[in-house]
């Protein structure tokens, strides 16, 4: 049994969309059917991994996109593809006598959204929940938060010496550093930027 016969592959942030030739996928399925091997097609319909459940690969950190398209025979939008029709044509040959496949449903319609303009804004730093206080930096799990984003904030002394350096280590997986609402730096684990030891803080 093949528990996961992949129609495509993972998509990772910052990389091109992964595809697999339709003929290669269909030939692999034919080889299994001819040998009476059970299989599960992963995926038949490319869906979506909602929220922050995309995951990542290690040891060379590579964050996965939340899309579950996987170059599947039925796309994330629910549309049939060349791969779908090649697979359908193959499966016709393995139906019991007298059986037939149902008609393919019409493609889902696409709506057109007229142009619009935003007229209101809600600044992030002006709309934060009540803070929790700690003398040490705690991981988000300590706040019963398994994923997402967390804000660490502190108040610096009024007089910050010239050349004062902020040291950040082991970022998982993305960080932005602000001082008085001004963006100073970004750290991106995908690019190997997991620490920052040369961030000079403003003195005013």
Q: Predicted regions span which residues?
A:
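Catalytic-core region of carbohydrate-active enzymes that cleave or remodel glycosidic bonds
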Residues: 1-73
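Short helix/loop capping segments that flank catalytic or ligand/cofactor-binding pockets
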Residues: 10-11, 50-53, 78, 177, ...
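Short, glycine/acidic-rich beta->alpha junctions
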Residues: 19-25, 148, 169, 191
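Generic, well-ordered alpha-helical scaffold segments in large soluble proteins
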Residues: 28, 35, 90-94, 155, ...
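Extended carbohydrate-recognition surfaces in non-catalytic/accessory domains of CAZymes
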Residues: 56, 68, 74, 79-82, ...
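Aromatic-lined ligand-binding clefts that engage carbohydrates, nucleic acids, or primary amines
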Residues: 162-179, 199
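A cross-kingdom feature marking solvent-exposed beta-strand/loop segments within repeated
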Residues: 178, 183-196
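Conserved small/polar residues in nucleotide/adenosyl-binding loops
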Residues: 197-203
